[in-house]
């Protein structure tokens, strides 16, 4: 079984590293001026993957902070997965052609499943991750500004049938709250789809990571960690030490 992977997160807005609370653009804290410097620090601490989100792109519905993502992928010895503002075949090709390991489709997976299936067929389920950001079980889109009538599990099952291998599940109510992840909902999605699910939102302690890691046999393949690292709840080194 593949090992449980920790993904330190870098959320970018105006070229800076920021964190939002529950995706609220008005509740922003800036943690650094350079995504590259932040990524370098994560890589030096042993990260194998870095999760990068283009918040400007998510809102504007087009790529905005892409040059920072490409710099990290090409100049550091890490795998990068990126989400935010990826809407077109050209966006996907732009990133994958420049050494980014995995592209996350979020809003477009809800709004245009046919396109998403086409991209899964073209690039395969390891390169195209499906980002399911849920509010009370329903998928939210457009930088979380809108909630759809689509259930996360239903969409997950449909896309799994068409080649999706990796899902990233975010419980919006937990994001940036340091309140602990919604392990139950993540396991439920993994069981419904039979695929790997990466947990995102709410990780606040090494105990939270242990709880997720203990569900590895149930399909939880990793965890994205953001605010907990930036507010020094624990170090990335400590989190990676237990990675297995």
From Swiss-Prot:
Keywords: Amino-acid biosynthesis, Cytoplasm, Histidine biosynthesis, Isomerase
Active-site residues from the entry: 11, 133
Covalent S-S links between cysteines: none
Subcellular location: Cytoplasm
Pathway(s) it belongs to: Amino-acid biosynthesis; L-histidine biosynthesis; L-histidine from 5-phospho-alpha-D-ribose 1-diphosphate: step 4/9
InterPro entries associated with the record: Aldolase_TIM (IPR013785), His_biosynth (IPR006062), HisA_bact_arch (IPR006063), Isoase_HisA-like (IPR044524), Isoase_HisA-like_bact (IPR023016), RibuloseP-bd_barrel (IPR011060)
EC number per UniProt: 5.3.1.16
PANTHER family in alphabetical order: 1-(5-PHOSPHORIBOSYL)-5-[(5-PHOSPHORIBOSYLAMINO)METHYLIDENEAMINO] IMIDAZOLE-4-CARBOXAMIDE ISOMERASE
UniProt similarity note: Belongs to the HisA/HisF family.
Protein name as it appears in the record: 1-(5-phosphoribosyl)-5-[(5-phosphoribosylamino)methylideneamino] imidazole-4-carboxamide isomerase
The gene coding this protein: hisA
């Amino acid at each position: 079984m593949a090992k449980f992977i920790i993904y330190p997160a870098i959320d970018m807005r105006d070229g800076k590293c920021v964190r939002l609370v529950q995706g609220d653009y008005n509740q922003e804290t800036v943690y650094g001026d350079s995504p590259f410097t932040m990524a370098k620090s994560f890589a030096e601490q042993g990260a194998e993957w870095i999760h990068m989100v283009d918040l400007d792109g998510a809102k504007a519905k087009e790529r905005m902070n892409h040059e920072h993502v490409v710099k990290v992928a090409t100049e550091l010895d890490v795998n990068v997965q990126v989400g935010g503002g990826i809407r077109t075949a050209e966006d996907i090709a732009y990133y994958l052609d420049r050494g980014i390991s995995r592209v996350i489709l979020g809003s477009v997976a809800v709004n245009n499943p046919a396109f998403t299936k086409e991209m899964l067929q073209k690039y395969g389920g390891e390169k195209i991750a499906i980002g399911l950001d849920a509010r009370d079980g329903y998928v939210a889109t457009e930088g979380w500004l809108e909630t759809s009538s689509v259930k996360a599990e239903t969409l997950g099952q449909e896309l799994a049938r068409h080649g999706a291998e990796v899902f990233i599940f975010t419980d919006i109510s937990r994001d940036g709250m340091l309140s602990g992840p919604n392990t139950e909902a993540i396991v439920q999605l993994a069981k419904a789809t039979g695929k790997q699910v990466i947990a995102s939102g709410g990780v606040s302690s090494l105990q939270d990571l242990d709880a997720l890691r203990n569900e590895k046999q149930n399909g939880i393949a990793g965890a994205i960690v953001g605010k907990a690292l930036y507010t020094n709840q624990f170090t990335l080194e400590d989190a990676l030490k237990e990675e297995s």
